[in-house]
Regions:
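A structural signal for the hydrophobic beta-strands that form the central parallel beta-sheet
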Residues: 37-38, 69, 147
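Active-site metal-binding loops of divalent metal-dependent hydrolases
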Residues: 41, 72, 102
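Structural signal for short hydrophobic segments within the conserved structured cores
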Residues: 68-70, 190
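N-terminal secretory targeting modules
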Residues: 1-38, 42-65, 78, 90-92
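Alpha-helical cap/lid subdomain in secreted, periplasmic
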Residues: 29, 50-63, 75, 79-193
């Protein structure tokens, strides 16, 4: 009997911890929302935002909203930080989505002399940049923010000319962890996959 009470108490404590640390699930877009999608080339040319818009316009034709792409090919989080006020908040959004990680995580450096040191430097830079980005996002109190975890990198693909960047996907996962942790207290989070 004592063991059952102890297990029940442990289960209760763990559920409080898990629920307290769960990221927020973003709420659906609403009538009149102005949504800006911040990102890199995946946002600029990936068209996922147009699919989201098509879903809303075909399922809820009377729900008018505007959606804008603020994706720029080749951008890393530090590039996005430089343009976030003008390119994103200059459109007076009610919702901002942000995704980054592919360019932040680097490329050919994984095949260099010291990829471990490179990853440490990049993660410091991404973390510092993301903290500054979060301050800007929090200062726009009337705007909901949704973090979208970065896309994965396929380290198994090979051809005669290119060598895969082994370790890149692990770095992307570290960046996604930063985004997910931010979602616990301030924003929503969606995995890209």
């Amino acid at each position: 009997m004592r063991t059952n009470r102890w297990l029940f108490s442990l289960a209760c404590m763990l559920s409080v911890f898990v629920c307290g640390n769960a990221q927020k699930t973003p709420s659906p877009f609403q009538r009149g929302d102005r949504v800006v999608f911040l990102g890199n080339s995946i946002t600029e040319g990936g068209h996922y935002h147009s699919y989201i818009w098509l879903y809303y316009i075909t399922h809820f034709p009377d729900m008018r909203m505007r959606m804008y792409s603020a994706g720029t090919g080749g951008d890393s989080s530090w590039d996005m930080l430089e343009r976030i006020e003008e390119d994103v908040y200059g459109k007076n959004p009610t919702v901002v989505t942000a995704t980054f990680g592919m360019n932040d995580s680097g490329y050919f450096e994984y095949n260099g002399d010291n990829p471990t040191a490179f990853v440490e430097r990049q993660m410091y830079r991404v973390d510092t940049t993301f903290q500054a980005m979060q301050k800007i996002m929090k200062s726009h109190k009337d705007t909901r923010v949704i973090m979208i975890g970065g896309t994965p990198y396929d380290e198994t693909w090979q051809n005669e000319k290119n060598k895969p960047f082994l370790g890149k996907n692990a770095t992307i996962q570290k960046i996604i962890r930063l985004q997910r942790e931010a979602a616990v207290t301030t924003v929503g989070f969606l995995p890209y996959t």
